[in-house]
Amino acid sequence: WDLAQDFASIAPYTIEEAYEVADAIEKNDLNHLRDELGDLLLQVVFHAQMASEQDAFDFNAVADAISDKMIKRHPHIFDTSQYRNAKTQTIAWEEQKAIERAELAAKESRAVSALDGVASALPALTRALKLQKRAARIGFDWPDAAPVMDKIREETAELQVEMDAGNGPGMVDELGDLLFSVVNLARHLDIDPEAALRAGNAKFERRFRHLEADLADQGLDPKDLDITALEAAWKNSKTHDNSTD
């Protein structure tokens, strides 16, 4: 199996392992975190080995590259004589990243953009947040959360128009705008949208599992109930969940 893999086929597993690391951290399970970090490290070793077999680079080169990058980006640690406070450290960090982006743009014969370096493979919510933060650095931003809420209402109304028209592509477009605006609201509220959605997922899962267990205790199968009965069971589950918070 290993011999049949390439970078693209392994990439989904690498992403999955990174999420499992995050899951262990959120659960504050250090034993699990140790195991998941090992699994993630194996992914790094696997990719490095495949690259080595193509005479591209090896694991040592990966370690050397990140070491060099950390030294360049953290002069306040490795050259403390120049950086006396957090503000100058942050400025130096941003200047170094700007230099790296400019070098990459020149290498690729294109103009430098404030959005350079935001990976396209990031989860959509995370990428939206990063794009918005980059745009905000050059002043392209709302002053506070209030106009963002107005924008959400506007996008919701535009989505409704497309829904009423039965316009599939239009619904996709407007729903994307709405989600992007919701991420923007999260940013203005200083909330990580990925963390907020994970918490929402966990709450739904917790309440739905309680719904299933409660119905099972009554000898009922959710599949046999209509939506009215399921809504009533859901409300009971929410009440139970809120009482245990």
Which residue ranges define each predicted feature?
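Flexible "arm" and connector segments at domain edges
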Residues: 1-36, 42-175, 179-245
